[in-house]
């Protein structure tokens, strides 16, 4: 297991999970206010969605967005779990680019989203020497 530190461009807002519904929505207690946030992960997230779990949201100031907040992280059993599926490749790219993944250190080439065949795409192509 790796501990990759990822920095967000905006400050995360801490709250308590109330519930998730309709796959895309979570209600969160922020101080004395209850807000509805966008849930970017439509998977079951079994074991993460317990009422009262600590969650971290990002505020979005885009007036075109229907919801002001987006769910980024859930704390479950002392672990912080990133739940925004849009961040997965950014986190891996950060780890590769900064030599944080020991098995893949000191690469000469890192290319995201490489097509090998017409319908086969890899998230990353990593090259070191002739490998």
Feature locations, PLM:
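Short aromatic-glycine-enriched beta-strand elements
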Residues: 22-27
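Acidic-basic catalytic patches of nuclease active cores, encompassing PD-(D/E)XK
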Residues: 46, 80-110
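OB-fold/S1-family single-stranded nucleic acid-binding modules
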Residues: 62-79
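Short, charged beta-turn/beta-strand-edge "cap" motif at the junction between a beta-strand
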Residues: 19, 59-64
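Conserved hydrophobic positions within beta-strands
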Residues: 15-17
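Short alpha-helix capping/helix-loop boundary micro-motifs
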Residues: 35-45
């Amino acid at each position: 297991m790796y501990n990759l530190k990822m920095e967000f461009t905006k400050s995360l807002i801490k709250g308590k999970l109330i519930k998730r519904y309709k796959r895309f929505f979570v209600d969160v207690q922020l101080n004395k206010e209850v807000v509805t946030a966008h849930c970017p992960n439509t998977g079951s997230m079994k074991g993460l969605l317990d009422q009262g779990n600590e969650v971290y949201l990002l505020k979005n100031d885009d007036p075109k967005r229907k919801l002001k907040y987006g769910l980024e992280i859930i704390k479950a059993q002392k672990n912080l779990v990133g739940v925004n599926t849009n961040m997965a490749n950014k986190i891996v790219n950060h780890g590769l680019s900064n030599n944080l993944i020991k098995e893949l250190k000191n690469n000469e080439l890192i290319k995201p989203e490489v097509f090998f065949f017409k319908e086969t795409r890899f998230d990353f192509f990593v090259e070191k020497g002739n490998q």
